[in-house]
Amino acid sequence: MAEILLDSDVIIAWLRGHDPFTTLIPDLLEREEVLTWTPVSVAEIFAGVRTGEERQAENLFLVLETQILSAEIGRKAGQYLHAYSKSHGVELADAFMAATAHVNRIPIWTLNKKHYPMRDVRFFSSSP
């Protein structure tokens, strides 16, 4: 059983019924993979929820485990911002996502790897 940190873009694609997420995510859950999100992703999802998506968004709490943000994660996010905000345009949300993945030693599943230029962050690939 592995743990995977879902980026907001993957969660949104799943919520909106985009393939291949509508089959991949249920398959992962069936295999008892632990799918997680951060409080930052929770905020991003609820900020952009469309009319009619509210119930689906609330149901995410039933299937996704929420990572806890800690001082260690905050420190690492600050280091990422210091190193990559000017050169790569890394923003606060992505710095927290990367720091959460790094500190907890779990891969990020994202559609935008360019948002994560950090060399010490691993990525989940849905490809075989």
Whereabouts are the PLM-identified features?
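Short, well-structured N-terminal submotif of metal-dependent ribonuclease cores
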Residues: 1-37, 46-62
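Active-site neighborhoods of divalent-metal-dependent phosphate/nucleic-acid chemistry enzymes
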Residues: 66-111
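Residue-level signal for well-ordered alpha-helical positions
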Residues: 17-18, 48-49, 80, 119-122
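Acidic, PIN/NYN-like endoribonuclease modules and their adjacent C-terminal/linker elements
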Residues: 1-3, 98, 102-128
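Structured helix-beta-strand junction loops
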Residues: 31-32, 63-64, 104, 119
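A generic structural signal for short hydrophobic patches within well-formed alpha-helices
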Residues: 11-12, 42-45, 74, 116
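Histidine- and aromatic-rich ligand-binding microenvironments
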Residues: 7, 37-38, 90-91, 112-113, ...
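General small-molecule cofactor/ligand-binding pocket signal
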Residues: 36, 67, 124
